[in-house]
Amino acid sequence: MNWWIDQYKQYHAQLSTNYPGNSLKPQLHHIVDLVKDTKSETLLDYGCGKGLQYTKWKHHEELGVMPSLYDPAVPEYEELPSGPFDGIYSTDVMEHIPREHLPEIFNNIFSRADKFVFLAICTKPAIATLPSGENAHCTVESIEFWKTMVEKYAPKRVYTHIKTYGTCNNYSILNEELYLEWYLSQF
């Protein structure tokens, strides 16, 4: 995985506009709804890029809370916070991770999430090319693949929303009964 992260560190360093954090905005309404529905107070943006979605564009104001930030290719966010977090979201990240590293990534995410996980995943090749010449989207798969990965590798069951876009536009909710149990316990 270190080779892959090094590729992204080089890519980030090439231009200040590479992965600034602009993949959050198209998904923000889904995440805001999840934060409100689950009354989440602690969040983690897993794969935040350079973080401009918070420092410049102030998207956290819509969330009602400033999330913790993690991106292994950005020096100021390279330390994975231990959590736990009420909610964890990742937008335009999973498709950048080599298939053989997905079990580790799902463990990192799902072991830290208490109320929800939201994954927005692109299902077509990227415009971006890494310094090695490889396409930045190395795991381009349908929503069924991603659902199977969550079911197989998440160390615990968490209320999960998966949105895919690109060549496979879909939305799926996993473990909805966990949310319903929690919701009903609020009364």
Where are these regions (language model features)?
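Substrate-binding/catalytic groove segments of enzymes
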Residues: K156-R157
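Conserved N-terminal segment of class I S-adenosyl-L-methionine
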Residues: M1-G87, P103-F106, R112, T123, ...
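Short "lid" loop at the C-terminus of a central beta-strand within the Rossmann-like core
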Residues: C122-A128
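A short SAM/SAH-binding and catalytic strip from SAM-dependent methyltransferases
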Residues: Y89-E100
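Short glycine-centered segments of the SAM/dcSAM-binding site in methyltransferase folds
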Residues: K115-F118
